[in-house]
Amino acid sequence: FDELFGRAVATYLTFNGTGANVMALTALARPGDAVICTDCAHINVDETGAPERVVGAKLIDLAANDGKLAPEQIADQAHAIGVAHHAQPAIVSITQSTEWGTVYSADEVAAICDMAHRHGMRVHMDGARIANAVAASGGTVAALRAMTVDAGVDVITFGGTKNGLLGGEAVVFLDPMSGARGQF
């Protein structure tokens, strides 16, 4: 994965996508945190409540436009930062490609990452179907890097089972220091 992303990364293997997403979010979240995602996000709809139960973070599910989250939606949620009565928006989770089959462009991902980082939030990409997004965006390593590491994504779950493997996913922390807690 270091070679694929063109830099040193911290990588951990998991059995399935739910485990990968839970591991990634747990490494980034603290008690009282919230994860911003779309209302159709896999972590919100299909993972049997594992992200909230295991991670202990509230999911804030926002209306998707063609399956996508917009930077303005992140900015709208930033009002809760520092308010003692609200879960603290700390992580933005996007899915690439989305549950609707749409693909975020590299520029869209970069805009989301920029908005999240401006508000002190980290960005998680559920990449169960990342190979499809890369294929739709040119099919090159450069396309993968443009929509992940170059755009500012902090952690990606890299799909194996939806891309032909019998079992297994990878959690890739694009900043190895962010992934230091992943091993625990």
Model-derived features with residue positions:
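Conserved PLP-enzyme active-site core in the AAT-like
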Residues: 1-184
